Amino acid sequence: MPRNIRVISIIFAFFASLTASAADPTATAYTADECCGTHIPYPERNHDTAIPDSLTAVFINHVGRHGARYPSSAANTTEVLRTLHRADSAGALTPSGRELMKLTDFVAAKSHNRWGALDSLGMAEQRGIASRMFRAYPRLFADGTVSAISSYSPRCVMSMYEFTHQLDRLNNSVELTTSSGRRNSPLMRPFDVVTEYVDWYKSREWKAPYDMYFETTAPTAPARRLITDPNYLSNSMAREVVWNEYKVLSGMPAMGLSIDLSKYFTTEELNALWSCQNLQHYLVRTATTLSSEPALIASELLLNLINTTDAAIEGKNANINLRFGHAETLMPLLSLMRLRGCYYMTNYFDTVALHWKDFDIVPMGANLQMVLFKTDKGDYCVRFDLNERPVPLLPNSDEIYTPWQQAREYLVHCLPLHLQP
């Protein structure tokens, strides 16, 4: 090869390597805790938001997710153990694989007969949220009334009872009424009963972009580290093994169990796996360029929030309305409201992880509190707290207190036309 061509080839290879190693602008570097996604326990909350002296809280609308729980089913642990036991029988399991097998056996045993149940951590989360609400708004609980409803799911029912029992412990003069069951599904489980959404979900319109992302993003290396034979698993099988491994391990903090995820995944691998789960939540639980149906299922719930606030102003409602549902209850609602950080429109789904983060939006025990205040002039304003942190309601505004009529007009416009009062 002539010398000048060799030099050009070396230079080209050098710049090609620079290009290949350049930072991916869509890559994330979230912490291991954050990469647990919706399994992350509720964040610590120690600081109360100062309320101006001119405002008096008169009503609270609360929509909450159940607290931390055991894994919802045995599916992921079963798949991990099936793969690892087969590899072990073939003499192809690494020390890391044996360690994972032992850990997965422990998770399965710990969850036996408790799949999906609220655990002690989840109970404590609900009691903590209730206690902070009580301390922040003591006047509302002085001979006040509390109305609570929940999904029929046992973990939601138990979350409601832990919350309301804590309020009763703090002040047993509070009048409490609770309701659970399928009659609450239109508000708490609309993903089960709204026909348009159920049909859209079954159409699997969302599946092609998700599968494409998963197949190009989910790593195979973690599975290769579990098994000595590099040919034991195909790439597609390895991705599925890693996915089930990730689901088992990332769910452990919600069980109150500590786990060092860095023993099984690099930071890059963990972020890649989380981004796949995050994208699936985004595609099937929020408004996207594919469809608005996932957000529209929360229309009845949003209308209920508007109507109960109106009724409170008219003196026809309880002091506090509590609702206990699921992450799948909150994600559509927050998207429908276009709440900051909870709504993102794009045709580039590889950017979703930068702008829409499930661990910020719906950790275990996630909640939206809509607090109505009366001003010293007799007017009303409202503040929205996501996970007990105030968030602006209106686009292009950082104000956290919004006049009720202005907030009401905005929320009504979020509803489909046939539901707008």
Task: Kindly label every feature range from the protein language model.
Residues 23-147, 151-321, 325-421:
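Signature for phosphate-centric chemistry
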Residues 1-25:
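Bacterial Sec-dependent N-terminal signal peptides
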